[in-house]
Amino acid sequence: MSSQHQYMSVNNTSSSRVGDIEHINFFRSGHLSEHIGSLCLSSEYSDVTLIVEGQRIPAHKVILAASSDYFRALLYGGMREANQAEVELQAPLQAFKALLRYVYSGHMGLSMLREDTVLDMLGLAHQFNFQELEAAISDYLRQVLALRNVCSVLDAARLYGLDALMDYCYNFLDRNATDILQHDSFLQLSVEALQGLLERDSFFAPEVDIFKAVCNWFNANQLWVKSEGGQAQVEKILKCVRLTLMSLEELLTVVRPFAPVTPDMLLDAIQEKTQTKSTELRHRGLLLPEENVATPKRGARVISGDMRSALLDGDTDNYDMERGYTRHTISDAPDNPGIVVRLATTTIINYIRLLLWDRDNRSYAYYIEVSVDQKDWVRVIDHSNYFCRSWQNLYFEPRVVQYIKLVGTSNTVNKVNNLYVVFHAVSLEALHTARVPPLCNGLIKPVHNVATVELSAVVIEGISRSRNALLNGDTEHYDWDQGYTCHQLGSGAIVVQLAQPYMLSSIRMLLWDCDYRHYSYYVETSLNYWDWEMVADRTRDACRSWQVIYFTPRPVSIIRIIGTNNSVNEVFHLVHLECPAQVEEAREDPAAKKQRPSPQENRLNPSNGSSSDASRASPPPAAEGPADPPRARSLPPAETATEADEYND
């Protein structure tokens, strides 16, 4: 057999082409990395010498360049170092050797290194643009973070611009504020890190303890304090300490003897403390991200209102007309105590989730105020003139609070002895969340459809075999008998109430379109069921199938659709309603649209509807359409009807 024949027949298997050599196990078993790793710190095949802290280290250009853009530019990018046999680098020696071992082997045992070496490694990974290594070291530092090293890790993160690691360190310090103030590592903080820490509202500890720790920091860093410009920095740091949060006794006995605090600073603090409302002072508070702090487990309790035990028990299923809620009598008195929840301590929150009693179609109006001392209150939610129901998702700017006051101003149904209107709240949660939706004038400006059962929207007027047919999102399964909501022309309407007021600028609807009929209608919105604003007038248009309506952004909690014409019979049929409109063009700012689509252009948009819309194209003349659908034989159990008869055709 010839040598050529032997070569051509290597690895001739059904899974490989003739001449292919598959030695994958050579790479998987680590043989290649072992061979490359053996070249680390070896002069064998070396073509460059790196000088670090005076020590010469043999290296290989191609391996360095393949591992990092920094070395690729340095050794092959036309810089003078590309033609030098020796290249000097500014780096700590031990950390650089560990970096080389990583470059040549892909392995690094961080747990075997000293903490200062690990931080040096982080700096080298940043300097030489080893992004994966930088991320891996950052993850490792998160895992081993402790009081002894958090300050040095924070300084390193600030130095290298590692925002995620820096935030993690600050959050760790927030959670351990009292302990870190007494730890020796606090004295090692850089000026910038110290100022950043003191500026945080979430660095929660008694202000007098913070002041004492800052004094200790000054004493431990006297060389810096006495340096040029040091005194100016001292004043900046002292301004980060919130003297107004201390008692007068603490100001006079603890702060006053400290030399850097001038008499003017002390007097200004006393004046601000005595003349400023507590709600206007900058407080510190406990921050527990994404955790409900209004629970008995966290020390919260209801201190005002009737049937207090229900509000914070977490049970949002078992409630009826007799139990499962906390209540208070609604009155016009400006000092109405309402329902008050006291948190265990001052806490930072920006989100309240509230469940209003919703076993019928009643609506409530209310407002929410917060306080740190139960004396000065600030209103964070004002729905006192808006109809609201069921679950309320309420967002506001982060605030430090200890008291939450819920005051009802209206209940559309309930009265006690026909005299007193009562406000009922089933559940309340309070937390700080990073998942804040877009807001406009304090109201949610939704991106996704909020007219859904899941978000507590409800059809309060209109006839349907299924109570939630209009809001269930089903735009495919409807026919002559089911899948729509309707009302008699000239009598009644279709009315949808959202759970709470939203800032809306568009609505999309699907008119019943199983034949070639067309409709006319108009749409109004309201906040209280008495005052209505028209947002669409299509009473003179022949409309069918999908309808997209744009209007100037406004608060909306109730939507009313009134049909004025049906080309086939005397009933207006609606299959689906959503707001805002879930089409790309509807998400564009209406103010930026040079020309809105006309009603005729919106008659039918197959791309926005179901796959069967193509068969529902422009209708032929009415005379060519099919006959009216048969009338249903019987009316289903009472739903949300407003008429005595059913209108399904």
What positions do the PLM features span?
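Conserved, well-structured core segments
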Residues: V48, P58-A65, V87-A91, D120-H126, ...
